[in-house]
A protein has these predicted regions:
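N-terminal secretory signal peptides that target proteins for export/translocation
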Residues: 1-10
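Extended interaction regions within the primary functional domain
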Residues: 2, 23, 30
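Bacterial N-terminal signal peptides
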Residues: 13-26
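N-terminal secretory/targeting leader peptides
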Residues: 31-142, 160-162, 166-377
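A gly/proline- and charged-residue-enriched helix-loop-helix capping module
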Residues: 139-156
Length: 377
């Protein structure tokens, strides 16, 4: 009782809601059902035992990462791969009453033994972890892969040592691009426009272009555009299509402003308590799930763009008639200049001078970009 009382009220509410969500399956934590009592079995008959079952909090509901990859893996593939010895039940975090900003803390406490947390949710408390997806840093997915590869050893060690969380996989969402209601030829023409953003780093990028960043929730993108509160919106290529943006915006710029990374992690105590053969299976199979999600994200980024402009190759979305604005040499120069002069320095300001060393020892060398200490005021 003392331990639970020490947990902040918001986290206790999340824990209570998760218990309700998983109640029909017997609770949140991994468990095995006990063997049938010997008295109920015939002499010499094998003892029946129920599968060992995991409770997983997954990523965002309703998107391909979850519906085509995470959910099938945990609900079906785990049992198939283990010959029925292990099973799992998964619920998306945004339908489980779990605040995205609290997921890391819930993992650390063990309230959520196994869960997916958006790295953008670290901005307020742990801005150092957001480094690999700064706005303008990764103009394509190949660059993002090398950026993350340079940062990953630091991230995994920090999560393990500072939070007691074992990072088992890192997922990616499709590219976040700019949709606009009025004609657009270059990024420079975003100056003066009110633009929906979803993170501090996107706001830094938009502000450096002379635009007006408007922090807006995903569900409010369409109402905000329709009401005229915003003129443009940064969102995923396919999620924008799903929202119906081709019917209310006319131009979409090809440059990925950000992507969106998520960590699938385990509370260390819960992880080490798993049967060794289950840990081995997950160590083998989760990298394959990660690779499949990255491939899915790359396909969906391209398909979203194809659908928005009404290309014949559109497969999963609704064909629109949008104008695709290519990345011009001027746009590429702007991206590089804004990244080095605004986005990176603002991240250092939020993160503190300790993050200068983190950057310069991880991402900086592979991107050819040196961070410097914030100037004291």
């Amino acid at each position: 009782m003392h331990i639970f009382s020490a947990i902040p009220l918001a986290l206790r509410r999340s824990a209570a809601w998760l218990c309700v969500v998983f109640a029909s399956a017997g609770g949140l934590h991994a468990q095995t059902a006990p063997a049938a009592p010997a008295s109920s079995a015939s002499p010499g008959a094998p003892t029946a035992q129920k599968p060992y079952k995991l409770r997983i909090v997954g990523g965002l509901a309703g998107i391909s990462q979850y519906t085509r990859q995470e959910e099938p893996f945990w609900n079906k593939e785990l049992a198939r791969l283990s010959g029925g010895r292990f099973e799992a039940e998964i619920v998306p975090f945004d339908r489980a009453g779990v605040p995205g900003s609290e997921m890391l803390r819930l993992l650390q406490l063990g309230v959520v033994p196994f869960g997916t947390t958006l790295m953008s949710s670290f901005t307020a408390q742990y801005p150092e972890y957001t480094a690999p997806d700064l706005a303008g840093l990764n103009p394509d997915i190949a660059t993002l892969k090398t950026t993350l590869a340079a940062f990953r050893p630091y991230l995994e060690k920090a999560l393990r040592d500072q939070h007691g969380v074992e990072a088992l996989a890192i997922y990616v969402y499709p590219a976040q691009v700019v949709f606009c209601k009025k004609p657009l030829r270059t990024l420079a023409e975003l100056s003066g426009r009110r633009i929906r953003v979803s993170s501090s780093t996107q706001a830094d990028f938009v502000g450096a272009l002379g635009g007006v960043p408007v922090l807006t929730g995903f569900a409010q993108i369409v109402p905000s555009l329709t009401a005229g509160n915003t003129e443009c919106a940064i969102t995923g290529t396919m999620s924008g299509n799903t929202l119906g943006l081709p019917s209310i915006t006319s131009h979409v710029h090809a440059l990925p402003i950000t992507w969106g990374l998520a960590v699938f992690g385990a509370n260390q105590t819960a992880w080490t308590a798993l049967p060794p053969d289950l840990r081995a299976l997950l160590r083998r199979e989760l990298p394959r799930l990660e690779a499949a999600i990255w491939e899915e994200s790359e396909r969906e980024t391209a398909d979203g763009m194809a659908c928005n402009r009404g290309a014949a190759s559109c497969a999963a979305g609704t064909k629109g008639r949008m104008t695709l604005v290519p990345v011009s040499p001027q746009d590429e120069r702007s991206r590089q200049d804004i990244l080095s002069s605004t986005v990176l320095p603002r991240w250092v300001q939020r993160c503190g001078n300790r993050c200068v060393d983190i950057w310069n020892q991880t991402i900086g060398p592979v991107r050819g970009l040196v961070a410097t200490s914030a100037v004291s005021k």
